[in-house]
Structure formats: C-alpha cells, structure tokens
Amino acid sequence: ADGVVLGILLPSGCVDATRTRQLSELARPMSTTFHRAFDMSADLQNSLDDVSQAGADRLLTSGGEPDCLQGTDAIAKLVKSARGRIHIMAGGGINAGNVAQILQRTAVSEIHVGLATAVQSPMLVRNPRVSLGKAPGREYHRAQVLEESVRELKRAIAQPPANERGER
C-alpha cells in the first residue's frame, strides 16, 4: 500500500489533531489522506489548519457540501488557504458531466471519483428465502467500473468547459 486514509473528529466537531498526528506518524513512509469526516467538522478553515499541522499529506473534501459541485467555492477557498502545505483533493459527486467545471472553479490538482456501476451478478443459483442485507436482492449485484466511464471522465478532464457563450 502507498497510503492510508483516516479521519477523526472530536464530539465538538473539531479535528482530533492528537490522534490524527499519531496515526499519520505511524503510517509513515506511506502518505496519509484525511477523509470527508472533514466535511462534518464545525469549522472548515480551522479544521484545515488542524489536519495540516497534524501531518496529513492530503485532505479529501466536498467543501462541506453534499457534493463537490455545490462546494466549489468552499473548496477553492481551502486550496488558497492550504498554500501548498497540504494537497486538497475534491471528492463527492464528481462525474464526467461536472469534472471540468469543478477543476476550473476550485484549482484542485487531485480528484476522487466513484465510477462504479451496479451490474448483475453472474450467479445462476439464487435463494429467494435468504437476503444478506436489509435490501433484498442486492447480493445478486456487484459494483464494476466500466472502461467507457473512465474514458469519458478522461475526455471531460482534457476538454475545458464551455463558457457562458458556449465557447471553449
């Protein structure tokens, strides 16, 4: 493994900087990413400082919003505030339809995407009396990343978004 993802908040909504520092040090020489627990914190700017000072290499965030598109302004502020101390990675709701806009508005150099699609399991034998979770039937689906989804995302990243007049 090249890296570890972690994220610890105190009940107050502040970053648990002590434990984050301990875990970051234990993870070395691997890189550490503080995950989207950050988006649940009480104050994004203070939390950015805490995560950075605790030794994490990167911060995964949607800007404290349900997805990155809604959080572009906050993510852009975090990128400016980070001033190279820590990498800001945008993550949450990114897809081929919005990635170029998110990259342009935020100036992040790293993104996290979930391109998995639910596909039918090849399992031929099915037991309708047994469910392995609360939602029946999910055991007969699996998550799969389709090559075309990755190509589509790469094309969207390579092509700048159109401006208000439709010009690229």
Q: Each PLM stretch: what is its role?
A:
Residues 42-54, 78-80, 88-90, 94-113:
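Catalytic cores of alpha/beta
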Residues 14-36, 72-95, 137-160:
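Alpha-helix-loop-beta-strand connector modules within alpha/beta enzyme cores
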Residues 1-5, 55, 129-132:
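Short, basic/glycine-rich phosphate-binding loops at helix/coil junctions
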Residues 163-168:
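Short, low-complexity, charge-dense intrinsically disordered segments
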Residues 23-26, 30-32, 47-59:
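Compact, aliphatic and Gly/Pro-tolerant "microcore" segments centered on a short helix or tight beta-hairpin
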Residues 39, 89, 108-144, 149:
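Active-site pocket-lining/capping segments in soluble small-molecule metabolic enzymes
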Residues 8-28, 41-47, 65-81, 97-101, ...:
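Active-site-adjacent beta->alpha loops and helix N-cap segments on the catalytic face
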Residues 4-6, 32-36, 59-61, 86-92, ...:
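Hydrophobic faces of well-ordered beta-strands that scaffold small-molecule active sites
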